[in-house]
């Protein structure tokens, strides 16, 4: 029975530099044990390793792939191993290939388990938790690792000493030899195609058709029979949520959300078309309650507003002529397209005002304006709180103060005393609101409230 020529490890005293994971190769050269993500675990001579932080790690370091490509900028502060390129190339050429699954599916058959003429083909390994074959798995269904090598050495020692380990046939060969592997664990990295220790792994490498991840990558594995289940083996990879989902949720909560409900903004972000006009058409997202800006993400609309283009009308309030402190409301009957001239008018009016991060828009229940300005008819003057839109608190700090009895729903002096405010009351009746001092409220306090719940006190951060 032939065994693979694996590296022989001996414990050696670490040098004064504090290097760890040192071993002697077959020639007696002091080497550093390194995991190569491209191939397997390698023994690189210590004289060919450049000093980095990898020598101070408690776990086995990995080989820096960026350094091999000439792109590592960390230098001596890198936490991976930097080694000479020619030495790494020579060591990689000595590696045949990584074990894929088992001897039955292409891995190297070190013990002739696939040869029917060899008695090793009648060796089975008993794994108590397995349901495949009643827990007795053929040796050909294993990849050669340290546990299998240890078990076979014990069997050889018992056979050489004359101790019977199994029933024998007429030719003196055992009919069936059972190896006990109840003390060894199953390698989860091998199941996920991520084990780089190959024959030197201290866990069992079992055929991937038998091992099924029953806990979605939690590290606990169960053995089952494919024929008994009557279907394909379960997924090998772990079913984990994407990191971008959590990132997008954080961005949705912090500040302005990534996608806006259709009830919140009747006119989405403007996008500049080839004809020089601004398009307001929106397309539905995969979420039924949200709609994206047609053609690109909201980030693109923000970036385009910084270029030679009109600012966003939904963010920049339209100021009434003669009343710079009173922003004009955009009603829900806004047309689907607007010309470049109108957009430039918005830009001029926006320039006369302030910065758009001083404004907030209501969630739902009224027209998408709610840029509450100086108004003493429907609502009180500047720096006052407005709570007419379903309990949401909004306000304005434009620095102009009150400028006469003008409702923010009507331009100029055309305010009518018969129309209704967003809270359903007549504009001729002043609404009691709580006054907020401008000194206690910063310009960054007026942000979008994504939670839909306004704290008591009026102002939402």
UniProtKB/Swiss-Prot annotation:
Protein name: RNA-binding protein ZCH321
GO cellular component terms listed in the entry, alphabetical order: cytoplasm
Disulphide connectivity of cysteines: none
Keyword Lipoprotein attributed: no
Gene for this chain: ZCH321
Functional note: RNA-binding protein involved in regulation of mRNA stability. Promotes mRNA stabilization by recruiting MKT1 and PBP1. Stabilizes transcripts encoding mitochondrial proteins.
Molecular-function GO terms, alphabetical: RNA binding; zinc ion binding
The keyword Zinc-finger belongs to this UniProt entry's keyword annotation: yes
Induction, as annotated: Induced during the differentiation of the bloodstream form to the procyclic form.
Zinc finger (C3H1-type): 63-85, 181-208
Lineage: Eukaryota, Discoba, Euglenozoa, Kinetoplastea, Metakinetoplastina
Highest taxon in the source lineage: Eukaryota
InterPro entries according to UniProt: RNA-bd_mRNA_stabilization_reg, Znf_CCCH
GO biological process, one term: post-transcriptional regulation of gene expression
Short motif MKT1-binding motif, span: 446-451
